[in-house]
A protein has these predicted regions:
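Alpha-helical transmembrane helix bundles of large polytopic membrane transport and channel proteins
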Residues: 22-23, 76-187, 497-575
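Solvent-exposed, non-transmembrane loop/terminal regulatory segments of multi-pass membrane proteins
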Residues: 23-69, 168-176, 411-414, 432-474, ...
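Extracytoplasmic
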Residues: 146-262, 266, 554-644
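Transmembrane alpha-helices and their membrane-interface boundaries in multi-pass membrane transporters
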Residues: 290, 306-322, 335, 339-343, ...
Length: 774
């Protein structure tokens, strides 16, 4: 191709990449909901787990502590932070131990008489009002006077204070200066976010809002704000993963460039060989944006990792070029084998699509499209752009010696049997369980952070994130009624110290029938005014001071019962909304549990309710979900393996040749499993993903080592290309193996071991007839 035509082709290719980049920039919406990478639930508990793992009330809680100043200063900071956060629509509840006059939306204040349990045992008559007013008189001479002055005219019986106490955590920390403190002299706060716990992006915004509000407070410069909770953990994990992936990516990229420059001594070839990889990435993302409304961030991260297979295509072309030979001639000779490798890798990645998990389906689409684009652009576009004059790598002195050493290696036929026996022994002697079902074991969070969370959770009486009490009824009101009926049994369990506290939906909203019953006990305006006038006799209050109270009671008499829908318009009602779930024609109520000491007692509570109440162990549900997930992936892998055998056998037209390709790949895969298990590593889903990637790389090695042209120079070129591929893979994944993030470490270690084992076994099990040079 003439120089002008080459420049035109390069410009068209670059314009196509720019167009793909524009499409991606316009359409790409990145999702951070981790549930996209979980399988579809099959049991009621799994469905509830998936719904509540990020949206449940416990997952939305942020635990805050402020330290580093005097108690008085910390109390002031606590009050200032709470005041700044309460009007913010990103938070549904902010608690710090102080009385919250605004806990109920102002428009809902008259409902306090329907929400409070006072009228269940005490009528609003003269005797009760007189007793309450005398108590308020005493209160006005106490330190609480400043708080009560604004409240007294509208609420002389302090129903709002009673509700605030009811809605506070059952196990509240010590109060100092009117706010919560820990035994370590930290001011404590509980904040519930609107954002789901497993939405790191929205949680980051909520956390940023808290930190900005805190740093804007006077006197905050010398104090330290610490956060904890599921949402905070999701943000920390995401930040740690990005940080480690970024620095590993930078170092490995620099190393990869240096490796290619050392291998080919051509900067132009290096730049041009990047075009198929860039095309693969942009085309894969563009197709994702067309096929899916949102693309998960993990899909992009894993997808770029899996596209590491595609970097081998231009490397093979560069290494196999002969001096004076046109690049088109080189690629034509390689294409049948490259096409087999591409098709085989695509079949392996189809296992992700067959898993049925949305995140893995995205991963399959991304990688398969990317591999096809990288492969075909390497075949039909790249050769026209490569420099015409190249150095034949087969003439390198070190490579001649390396190939001679490889040729002299013993290749006894019993190697496969020996490796298989070693695998069996290692698997038999491996300690601990084979599979890792506990997702918590994959957390990269430091122990100190987890201990800090446990300490704050205990001090604040925050709900347990493992257990939920699930109530089931045919209607929403049925759930609230069941919740109310269950309360005496819960109180008995608390008295027996089986549990510290259980927060039920009726805790926030009584059923309609209970509200109507209380409403009927409210006196009419004339009766209330008469009783109030009598109660005021002899007390120093103005006669008209309590007219707002009289008006609220009159308003409450005519109010329709408060429903969850209307309640949800207030911040506190959004907390109730998180505790009520409609599914499959019935309603569920979710009770959060704090300080569970006797699991059996709570399970017995469920057994006595004819199935309407049950204790949900989210850990057990997640483990069953992971096991089901793994089963589906393994089934998909089995089908993909069978297709792979058929594809390789068809492409090579020989069972013997197929054996030389598939046997080392299979043995190397199981050898990685055996070594990791012998080291005590439990196999997780991420190890399976890494094994598939390593298998795709190993398939390339075996295919090209099996290709015996009878030409020693071509054998050296094959060895050169494979060594460059192996070193580049070890560079990237070896770095990942040193990461502190368990997921990254699992992928890095597994692929690094896989690359090493695949390379060695592909050489030792390749057909070998040494051809002497003339």
């Amino acid at each position: 191709m003439r120089m002008g035509a080459r420049i035109t082709l390069l410009m068209i290719w670059l314009l196509a990449l720019a167009a793909l980049g524009w499409v991606v920039s316009q359409r790409l919406k990145v999702s951070t909901d981790l549930r996209s990478f979980m399988p579809a639930p099959t049991t009621p508990d799994q469905r509830l787990l998936m719904e509540q793992v990020g949206d449940g009330p416990g997952s939305r809680l942020l635990l805050l502590s402020i330290a580093g100043r005097s108690d008085a200063q910390l109390a002031a900071l606590s009050r200032g932070l709470a005041a700044a956060l309460k009007p913010d629509r990103r938070y549904t509840q902010v608690l710090n131990g102080s009385f919250d006059l605004g806990a109920l939306d102002p428009s809902l204040l008259p409902y306090r008489y329907l929400l409070s349990s006072t009228l269940d045992t005490q009528p609003l008559d003269e005797a009760y009002l007189a007793d309450q007013l005398e108590q308020r008189l005493d209160d006005l001479s106490s330190p609480a006077a400043s708080m009560l002055k604004g409240l007294l005219p509208r609420d002389p019986t302090l129903e709002m204070l009673k509700l605030a106490e009811r809605w506070a955590p059952a196990k509240s920390p010590q109060l100092r200066d009117g706010v919560w403190f820990s035994p370590r002299h930290e001011a404590l706060l509980l904040v519930q976010t609107v954002a789901a716990g497993f939405d790191p992006g929205a949680q980051q915004q909520a956390i940023d809002g808290i930190e900005q509000a805190f740093h804007a407070l006077p006197g905050s410069s010398g104090a330290k704000l610490d956060l904890s909770g599921p949402g905070y953990f999701s943000v920390v994990i995401g930040a740690q993963t990005r940080h480690q992936a970024d620095w590993i990516g930078r170092i490995s990229t620099i190393g990869f460039i240096a490796l290619l420059l050392l291998a080919y001594r051509s900067f132009s070839s290096l730049l041009l060989s990047a075009l198929p990889i860039a095309s693969a990435a942009l085309a894969g993302i563009a197709v994702l944006t067309l096929a899916f409304p949102e693309v998960h961030g993990i899909t992009l991260a894993f997808g770029f990792t899996l596209l590491g297979v595609a970097q081998e295509y231009p490397i093979r072309v560069l290494s196999h070029r002969r001096a004076g030979e046109d690049a088109l001639q080189s690629v034509r000779a390689l294409w049948p084998l490259l096409l087999t490798a591409i098709a085989s890798a695509c079949i392996a990645y189809l296992a992700f699509y067959a898993s049925g998990v949305n995140g893995l389906k995205q991963l399959a689409v991304f990688t398969i499209v990317g591999l096809l684009v990288a492969g075909f652009s390497t075949r039909y576009l790249l050769p026209h752009l490569l420099p015409r004059r190249v150095r034949d790598v087969a003439e390198m002195g070190w490579l001649i010696k390396a190939r001679d050493w490889v040729d002299r290696l013993p290749r006894p036929r019993w190697i496969p049997a020996l490796v298989a026996l070693a695998i069996a022994l290692m698997l038999a002697l491996a300690p601990g369980p084979f599979w890792q079902n506990n997702l918590a074991a994959l957390t990269p969070l430091p122990t100190a952070m987890l201990q800090h969370d446990a300490r704050l959770r205990d001090a604040l009486g925050a709900p347990d994130v493992r257990y939920l009490l699930v109530l089931q009824a045919s209607t929403e009101q049925g759930v609230l009624a069941l919740s109310e009926q269950l309360q005496p049994q819960i109180d008995a369990l608390i008295a027996k110290h089986a549990v510290d506290a259980v927060e039920l939906p009726s805790h926030y909203l009584p059923p309609t029938a209970r509200q109507q019953e209380r409403q009927q006990k409210l006196p009419d305006r004339a009766t209330l005014q008469q009783d109030l006038d009598a109660a005021l006799q002899g007390l120093p209050f103005r006669a008209d001071l309590f007219q707002p109270f009289v008006q609220d009671v009159e308003t409450a008499r005519a109010l329709p019962p408060l429903t969850p829908e209307k309640y949800a318009q207030s911040p506190l009602g959004q907390r109730l909304a998180a505790m009520l779930v409609q599914r499959d024609g019935h309603w569920l109520g979710l009770g959060t549990i704090s300080g569970i000491h006797d699991v059996a007692a709570l399970q017995a509570l469920g057994a006595s309710s004819h199935g309407n109440v049950r204790l949900l162990d989210l850990k057990a549900a997640s483990e069953s979900l992971v096991a089901a997930y793994r089963t589906r992936i393994l089934q998909a892998l089995l089908i993909a393996s069978l297709l792979l055998v058929l594809t390789i056998s068809f492409a090579l037209r020989s069972a013997r040749r197929a054996w030389h390709v598939l046997a080392p790949m299979t043995l190397a895969t199981f050898l990685v499993l055996a070594v990791e298990r012998l080291a005590g590593i439990e196999i997780s889903l991420f190890h399976l993903v890494a094994l598939i990637l390593a298998g795709g790389l190993g398939l390339h090695y075996a295919l090209f080592f099996e290709r015996d042209t009878g030409d020693p120079a071509e054998q050296r070129r094959t060895l050169h290309a494979t060594i460059v591929c192996v070193l580049s893979a070890l560079l990237v994944f070896g770095m990942l193996a040193w990461a502190t993030i368990p997921v990254l470490r699992a992928i890095g270690l597994t692929v690094s071991l896989g690359v090493a084992f695949h390379f060695c076994l592909s050489i030792l099990m390749a057909p070998h007839t040494h051809v002497a040079e003339d």
